[in-house]
């Protein structure tokens, strides 16, 4: 039986958007702490990233933080949460889904997918 945990959308929105901040994206240590060792991302470009590749890509990202819309969360298990939202910069938008997993008391991003979306 899965024990239900209280879901705090504001907490998960902060976790997710923390990675959108340039200072965080450009910090190898902060990103490494937030991403699980088995992290995988399917980017809107069609590329697949593991943890090391994602850290390298984020470390050189100089873009502004995207606007976030339609944010939602759903518990998948007692220590696993699905986050979904739409984000965009300029005229480029994507639907995003992330899976956050609590390991040793810390929430870490284990999966992320971005799918190009119409504005």
PLM region spans:
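A beta-strand edge to alpha-helix "cap/lid" segment located at domain peripheries
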Residues: 2-33, 38-119
């Amino acid at each position: 039986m899965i024990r239900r945990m209280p879901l705090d959308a504001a907490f998960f929105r902060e976790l997710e958007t923390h990675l959108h901040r340039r200072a965080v994206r450009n910090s190898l240590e902060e990103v490494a702490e937030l991403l699980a060792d088995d992290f995988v991302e399917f980017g809107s470009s069609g590329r697949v990233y593991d943890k090391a590749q994602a850290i390298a890509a984020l470390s050189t990202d100089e873009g502004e933080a995207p606007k976030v819309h339609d944010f939602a969360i759903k518990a998948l298990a007692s220590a696993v949460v699905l986050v979904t939202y739409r984000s965009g910069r300029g005229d480029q938008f994507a639907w995003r889904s992330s899976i956050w997993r609590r390991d040793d008391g810390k929430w870490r991003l284990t999966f992320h997918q971005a799918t190009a979306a119409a504005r």
